């Protein structure tokens, strides 16, 4: 049976491993590194988190490891359970258990995580992304009312397209971001920094949005396929000019973007050729 992998934070119990009976010698950071080295051999990991045992238990640590693929998690569990791995005593490895009645909201992966997942399954040359439109929204309302525009918080809208040539697939995405400009942060340099940050965040949100419409299909043979599920607005956006319809709809749902996984700017790098579209004249 084929496995479907979406570009969301993995929460299903069959993708989560619980590892315990970890020794007390190494610190938690060293244990996390060792666990990552061992378990990443079975597939791409979302996270490795190490915790100290409860006070009522004997000294030691346990870990929670999240895979993107349930198949990878099951293979890792069978291969590592009861083995010493990187320590002298064996560890216990179990698949996570969770009551079926519990429902957890699926949070979209941030752009860095989306690209990491795409690189793993499609290869670095198996996909690409491009900016279709980058528009500054700050002051547009004042301009429409013929009111002199004041320098406020920079707000940008970005439309991108993720392209997968081997699969003949294109997925559009839209993101909006605003960087609040406080009164104490006056001056041209502060405004330009906020403006550049807003551009980056809008780009990140657009890339993540494009990946949300894609699902990785891992066949039993190990081959990879892609499922594309466009929204109704995407079906109307057949050309770059028609993307205005998609942009207008996305503006109305901007408030929903706060529910997505937060992304740190330190994990993101925007190529200079992308920024050429953003530089103020």
Curated annotation (Swiss-Prot):
SMART domains noted in UniProt: RRM
Main location: nucleus
CDD domains reported in the protein's UniProt record: RRM_RDM1 (cd12364)
Domain of life: Eukaryota
Span list, region Necessary for nuclear and nucleolar localization: 90-133
Its biological purpose: May confer resistance to the antitumor agent cisplatin. Binds to DNA and RNA.
Free-text domain note: C-terminal half contains cytoplasmic retention domains as well as determinants involved in its stress-induced nucleolar accumulation.
Protein's name according to its UniProt entry: RAD52 motif-containing protein 1
Lineage: Eukaryota, Metazoa, Chordata, Craniata, Vertebrata
Encoding gene, per UniProt annotation: Rdm1
């Amino acid at each position: 049976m084929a496995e479907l992998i979406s570009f969301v934070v993995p929460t299903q119990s069959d993708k989560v491993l619980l590892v315990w009976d970890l020794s007390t010698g190494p610190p938690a950071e060293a244990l996390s590194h060792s666990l990552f080295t061992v378990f990443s051999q079975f597939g791409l990991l979302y996270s490795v988190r190490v915790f100290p045992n409860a006070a009522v238990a004997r000294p030691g640590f346990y870990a929670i490891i999240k895979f993107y693929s349930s198949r990878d998690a099951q293979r890792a569990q069978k291969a590592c359970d009861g083995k010493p791995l990187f320590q002298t005593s064996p560890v216990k490895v179990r698949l996570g258990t969770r009551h079926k009645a519990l429902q957890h909201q699926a949070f979209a992966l941030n752009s860095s995580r989306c690209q990491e997942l795409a690189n793993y399954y499609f290869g670095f040359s198996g996909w690409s992304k491009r900016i279709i439109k980058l528009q500054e929204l700050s002051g547009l309302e004042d301009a429409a009312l013929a009111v002199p525009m004041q320098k406020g918080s920079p707000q940008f809208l970005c439309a991108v397209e993720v392209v997968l040539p081997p699969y003949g697939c294109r997925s559009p995405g839209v993101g909006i971001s605003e960087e609040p400009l406080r009164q104490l942060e006056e001056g041209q340099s502060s405004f330009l920094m906020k403006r550049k940050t807003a551009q980056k965040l809008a780009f990140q949100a657009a890339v993540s949005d494009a990946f949300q419409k894609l699902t990785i299909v891992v066949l039993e043979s190990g081959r990879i396929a892609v499922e594309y599920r466009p929204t109704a607005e995407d079906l109307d956006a057949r050309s770059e000019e028609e993307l205005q319809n998609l942009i207008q709809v996305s503006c109305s749902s901007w408030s929903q973007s706060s529910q997505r996984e937060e992304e740190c700017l330190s994990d993101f790098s925007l190529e200079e050729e992308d920024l050429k579209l953003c530089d103020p004249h």
